Amino acid sequence: MTRLTLFTSLCLAGTALASIPATAIAAPPGYDKIDTVVVIYAENRSFDNLYGGFPGANGLANLSAGQVRQLDRDGKPLTELPPAWGGLTAKGVTPPVTEAQSAHLGNASFAIDDASGFNEKTSVITRDLWHRFYQEQMQIDAGRNDKFVAWADSGGLVMGHYDGSVLPMWAVAKKYVLADNFFQGAFGGSFLNHFMLACACVPVYPHADTSPVKGQISAVEANGTTLKVADNSPASALGGAPKFVNDGAITPDFYAVNTMQPPYEPSANKPAEGGDKALADPAQPTTLPPQHDITIGDLLSLKGVSWAWYAGAWQATLDGKNATPVPNFQFHHQPFNYFAAYAPGTAARTEHLRDGGMDGAEFIKAIDDGKLPAVSFYKPQGNLNEHGGYADVASGDQHLADVVSHLEKSPQWSHMLVVVTYDENGGFWDHVAPPKADRWGPGNRIPAFIISPYAKMGTVDHTQYDTTSILRFITARYDLPVLSGIVARDKALRNNDQPPMGDLSAALDLSR
């Protein structure tokens, strides 16, 4: 597909190109030393959950009891943590840590892998936790981060953390740069935070109130940030998980903020009977209509910059070989598969949505062969992404470190920037309040690694970043127009007297 054809198709699709500035600011000096940008997107860990003990980072070591203490739903301190409802370990783990065994923990953060406690190492899969748009805002509690337990479905598990020093990526962090002030782009889960990486935008469901999704419109209080609590919800977090009038995927003004399925295969929603086999059934209430916002990929293509999204186990899933627990391909982790510009049959889809291979083999082959495009995004398959409930930390972390090792040996390494981060916190508590910005975020703090021959080696970067900081660097490096969501985030930060988000360059020495 030519740049002109792509531009025309985007306009005809009703995109927001008119809201994107027509010109871009020239790249700052030194940015052109980076020829290859690689973004690796893991899953569902807060900074404190894995890196709260990292030397020099803003972690857990010096926190007072008051900074950790959690409040009940009535605003009073909990006398203890509730048990991990349903058990601390995921279904099928043997021996399990049961709900009863997890009861009566003190009101504090605790080590999941403590040998004198639960002794559940990073190789053990723990249960999943709520990580949803409205609940996260309720947990943050206006920046106090003191109601994570109150508005969780997993009881006290949200306060758990690990000794991250046993992880291979800990050594990578010590060698390169660990960012300890990096926040997920949006409140909530993977679905929305993958859109933040692709377009700094929030998907929409037009006319949701008259569509199959009408039952998923959330019941929200007048403040717009709090779900309406059901009459039969337990008054205390010690009595069980909260219940809501309607905790759906759609906001009252029809934005999709919790998990919806792609309109194109591969999707968790199969094609309609007798319908196009390349399309998910649009009548299913969890199928999101095709989206038309401008993405970072669109802007790169219009500038003639090569790029690709590599999805682990993409082709295997298209071939009907997805399975649980391996590879456990996650359909809603593929943001470009929601956009009309990359619909089945388009040249753009063929060029830019690539198979990362089983266990990342195809992505690693491109690394080893020196054939990565200028900008690459890599999404590991489900069992290697560290998501609670179906993946363990150790396997995913080892995979990340293995990929980094290949990148260090790549023919393209000498002018490469690698960013390894997580999509969101996965429901786990973190003690740092997110900066106040716009309606969508940013959400909680997550680990991020800046890896490059130009990295300020062996340092912790305290610069304020969020997921859009990755897009900011790409935008600056390739002289792209600024996505409207980034413009809006910048304005919101200024309006709330918050510092701007960095573009990752503070972690680099581009004067070499």
What residue spans do the PLM features occupy?
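Gram-negative bacterial Sec-dependent N-terminal signal peptides
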Residues: 2-24
